[in-house]
Amino acid sequence: MSKSLQAIRGMNDILPEQTPAWRYLERTFAGLLDGYGYSEIRLPILEFTELFARGIGEGTDVVDKEMYTFLDRNGESLTMRPEGTAGCVRAVLEHGLSGGGQVQKLWYTGPMFRYEKPQKGRYRQFHQIGVEVFNLPGPDIDAELIILTWRLWQKLGMADAVTLQLNTLGSSEARARYREALVAYLQERFEQLDEDSQRRMTTNPLRILDSKVESTQALLVGAPTLHDYLDEESIAHFEGLKARLDAVGLRYEINQKLVRGLDYYCRTAFEWVTDKLGAQGTVCGGGRYDGLVSQFGGKPTPGVGFAMGVERLVLLLETLGVIPAELNRPADLYVCAFGEPAELAALTLAEQLRSAIPGIRLLVNAGAGSFKSQFKKADKSGARFALILGEDEVANRVVGFKPLRDEGEQQSIAWDALPEHLAACLAQA
């Protein structure tokens, strides 16, 4: 017996009862971004592997362990995008969008792919909403991005469930000095480090700060801190950011171990975290990447952005119980028709009602069936009202109009009067 077909592990179907919450989140965010003057960009899922090797960084877990990479028929190494920033930077460079210092404020959404161990809130195909800004070097735009996310949490009813963690990673020179000091400190304790941290000593030692292993965190208690090695310009940038967040009353925590998982970040780094989802607590993260464009061969261009995980945000909305009930509202009207003339009349009336009452949720019975079976389907649909059309109704140009959710009596309504009558009934809800 052949194996039944099923989805690949960690790549999930989003079923009809789940999609309203996704659409709600995406619509809310798109509307918010439009109000802030951001433009959508749509990016390909496949990119040349070199893009991520250069952008994310050799030696990172993403590049070394997690990317879906393959050779195409021309022998080119291609990768399914594990994140969105590198592809967005590539598009900005390729199409000259940042030339002449022009400011670009962009956003995108779509699936990303990483070969990780699937668990609640962490999948191999996952979806992100990302925002990237180019050619604005100051802390004011960093603050705008963070405030924008804060406003989104307020709109979604989850502001009290998330906490902003903030850090500065300084300049590349400051990080190089700090890296040297951190490596010297940890080298003396190398045998006590966990296996992953030992590997990171030669590839990306700053990521050791973010280790989830308790024994490694205990070793870091006496380690030098990045803030002791910061340059004056980075300190001023960070103070400017904090002043702006303070001005709008946005609370935050300084987390000196927050380094983010990708090599391209500098100066500002931030995450929004929650304690409502267990181990998968980060719902949004980002920061500044002023050197990334030049890494790809472009002129030095300031950049800053963030990405948020849609699956985790939807999971958090469900956990908090703040998904609006009206997202899953049933149909307003179910049209039952008996006989071919009635079916043709039902189709015509339905389209007239859709034109007359924008936003109406109207179902027309398909597949014929007896009066009893159609009424059963009307009731199961959850519709508030049913329209009934048979030979007599068509001959007299009327419909039977029956409430399905209260004790109201069935009425006979002329076709011409139906839009006004139905609109009045719907308005009474």
Swiss-Prot record:
Coiled coil: none annotated. Its EC number is 6.1.1.21. Disulfide bonds: none annotated. Its main location: cytoplasm. Keywords: Aminoacyl-tRNA synthetase, ATP-binding, Cytoplasm, Ligase, Nucleotide-binding, Protein biosynthesis. Gene3D superfamilies: Anticodon-binding domain (3.40.50.800), Bira Bifunctional Protein, Domain 2 (3.30.930.10). GO terms for cellular component: cytoplasm. GO terms for molecular function: ATP binding; histidine-tRNA ligase activity. CDD domains: HisRS-like_core, HisRS_anticodon. InterPro entries: aa-tRNA-synth_II (IPR006195), aa-tRNA-synth_II/BPL/LPL (IPR045864), Anticodon-bd (IPR004154), Anticodon-bd_dom_sf (IPR036621), His-tRNA-ligase (IPR015807), HisRS-like_core (IPR041715), HisRS/HisZ (IPR004516), HisRS_anticodon (IPR033656). GO terms for biological process: histidyl-tRNA aminoacylation. Homodimer. This is Histidine--tRNA ligase. It comes from Pseudomonas aeruginosa (strain ATCC 15692 / DSM 22644 / CIP 104116 / JCM 14847 / LMG 12228 / 1C / PRS 101 / PAO1).
